[in-house]
A protein has these predicted regions:
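Phosphate- and other anionic-substrate recognition elements at nucleic-acid/protein interfaces
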Residues: 1-158
Length: 158
């Protein structure tokens, strides 16, 4: 059984965890020009994400619920990224479940609080559990997508 974990957003990551292999990668993105002023926006490259996920042949995917803050300039990109991920999963015919970050963070990272502390704890745990991916994890800055997959494949017993 192959489980995919997705840390939603253009700065996120995704991982596929199978019994005998693991894959971790930053979210594929592209820059687009939007509107009359041609403002540059970073978007998930949905066709590439679809190809990557399809190639992993996952049994199920778990993706983190997008940021639901009060600032429009953060909510809209998060929703746009979330929609792209959903489309990629649906086109690949991968069943998915949207989960709250606390579902996996609390059991794996404990009582760590604060965004920067959580990123650091995620990176350290990811490097400890998957030393063969330490370079990629460190370069990305956290292992959230990998830890989501790890939690649902190995801890929660899915």
């Amino acid at each position: 059984m192959t489980i995919v974990g997705i840390d939603n957003g253009t700065s996120g990551s995704w991982a596929a965890l199978a019994p005998d292999w693991v894959y971790f990668h930053r979210m594929p993105t592209k820059v687009s020009l939007l509107g009359k002023k041609e403002r540059r926006i970073t978007r998930i490259d949905m066709p590439i994400l679809h190809e990557q996920i399809y190639a992993a042949k996952p049994s199920k995917a778990y993706l983190e619920r997008p940021f639901t803050g009060r600032f429009l300039n953060a909510v809209l990109p998060a929703q746009r990224a979330f929609e792209a991920v959903l489309i990629a999963l649906e086109q690949a015919r991968v069943p998915y479940e949207v989960v709250d970050s606390k579902t996996w963070q609390k059991p794996l990272l404990g009582a760590v609080k604060g965004s920067e502390n959580l990123k650091k704890a995620s990176m350290e745990l990811g490097c400890r559990l998957y030393p063969e991916l330490a370079y990629q994890i460190t370069k990305h800055g956290d292992a959230d997508g990998l830890l989501i997959a790890h939690y649902f494949a190995r801890v929660a017993g899915q």
